[in-house]
Amino acid sequence: MSHSDYNFDIEQNAFEKEAPKVSIERKGDVVEEEVIATGEVENYAEPKSRNFLQRFFDDFKPALTTRGDGVALKRKLTSRHMQMISVGGAIGSGLYVGSGSAFADGGPASVIINYILIGIMMIFVIYALGELAIAYPVAGSFNTYATRFIDPAWGFAVSWNYFLNYFVTCPLELTTCAITFKFWTEINSAAWISIFLAVVIVINLFGVRAYGEVEFILSTIKVIATVGFIILAIIINCGGVPTDHRGYIGGSIIKQKPFRHGFKGFCSVFTTAAFSFSGTEIIGLAAAEVGNPRKSVPSAVKQVFWRIAIFYVVSLILIGLLVSPDDPRLMGNGDVSVSPFVLAIQEANIKGLPSVFNAVIIISVVSVTNSTTYTAARTLQGMATLKQAPKFFSYTDRVGRPLIAMVVVLLFGFFAYINEADKNGSDISDTVFDWLLAISGLSSFFTWGSICLSHIMFRLAFKKQGHSLKELGFVSPMGIWGSVIGLGFNILCLMAEFYVSLFLIGGSPNANDFFQGYLAACIALAFFIGYKIYDRSHIPSLDKLDIDTGLKTYDNQDEEKEEYSSKGPLNILKKAWNAVC
């Protein structure tokens, strides 16, 4: 069989000048799907008749198409996957579980105000990310943007900070799964950790398509459950549940103690709210593996507003109306910890339903664990392609899995078994996990702030070098000022966390608690200074900033004519729908 039996379709990659996108097709059948790749086709083996085991083991071999840095991520995510990743991706333990400690620390009014503020900030961040992701749909996404548009040293610091955030989250989420099961039984937590770790490993072994399908299913369940809870909570508040002897509740609970622990309590909720929204930016990473980012990413970005408005703000307002922040069962108030969502249902004396929602919480935690593994592995691989991590982490197999990076992340998941060390009466696991959280605690603020700053630098350089916004496939309606506001919000949140870390709620300043709250900032600064000394990188001027390499431009006028070819009311409705969805 000769090369004449194959058609090679090579297209310029989205980010590298010498980075063709290669699809190899044999006459009569497809040998390889399109991949994000650069460089040359290497080590091609002619397709043969193979059984399942042969195909399975061959899939772990180096990718058929590789580039100099070894990346060959496949575009296997569809618009359907992107929609659910954006809507349900961050509906997880941060909302269902973490919000309990926020109510205990700051009270319902602080929670509602802070989540609205962080939600507004996230809208600015995600629209900026959407614009960049369409222009440069690359592996590494926003970490790559920070390296290119801000400073290589800062990109290095943010990338490692972001990776560590998701790297340490895997065992933490597995532990949350085990704790959540204690609602029903006191079975050894190691058993539950083993089960869920095995599930996550299997999902990731099947590659990005499996990740997309699993997230689609789990996110659908989370969305349905949250909408169902909102409807039920309204009925409970209005006194429509026969088993709830409290009758009409209205605002009687929230009026009792809207704020807890004063200004300190208010500031403390910032970090909890940020943790809840953590993961929203994953759509930027997924842009490198979606078939048509020009159509899929903008739609996913627009869905973020509705998710924030409905799933976060509305549900937390209803929690504030139904659950007292002084309840000792609330997470953060005592030894017996229950999700505020489950607690709201329990208070209405509805039998069976608390168990159903607790199961939904477990599903959401599995979803978050799956997403953290996906994100950490892709981030580590992206860093390796930029020479910010050892090169072997860029290894990608034939089905598009960043195999070595993925294995390292999954192996760290076994760290969750440290919970078993507490059986002898010690609290070693609490201490270890507190410091693991400290390593990653502020990562989201650095990442989101960097996205905004990257967008600002990109826009300024884009204008300086004579480009028009009409060349872009998607333009953030918030503009450059939206990114300025988003960056300011992130700086404000970092200041608030510094204040809370230094002046503890109910305690005096001490080094241990301060570094548990602010260690991530120290680590990011150390990464930045260390790389700056090593690489002696500098920030280029706007007129010299390279924005042309790999920039994907679009003829938006032709696309709009095709998309809105119909006239009349139908066209108006179509435009209105696309503006918000």
From Swiss-Prot:
Topology class, membrane: Multi-pass membrane protein
Organism: Schizosaccharomyces pombe (strain 972 / ATCC 24843)
Pfam (any one): AA_permease
Name of the molecule in the record: Uncharacterized amino-acid permease C359.01
Keywords: Amino-acid transport, Membrane, Transmembrane, Transmembrane helix, Transport
TM stretches of this protein: 84-104, 109-129, 149-169, 187-207, 216-236, 266-286, 304-324, 348-368, 399-419, 432-452, 485-505, 514-534
PROSITE patterns on file: AMINO_ACID_PERMEASE_1
Gene3D superfamilies: Amino acid/polyamine transporter I
GO MF: amino acid transmembrane transporter activity
Lineage, uppermost ranks: Eukaryota, Fungi, Dikarya, Ascomycota, Taphrinomycotina
GO biological process assignments: amino acid transmembrane transport
Protein localization: Membrane
GO cellular component: membrane
Family stated for the protein in its record: Belongs to the amino acid-polyamine-organocation (APC) superfamily.
InterPro entries xrefs: AA-permease/SLC12A_dom, Amino_acid_permease_CS, APC_YAT
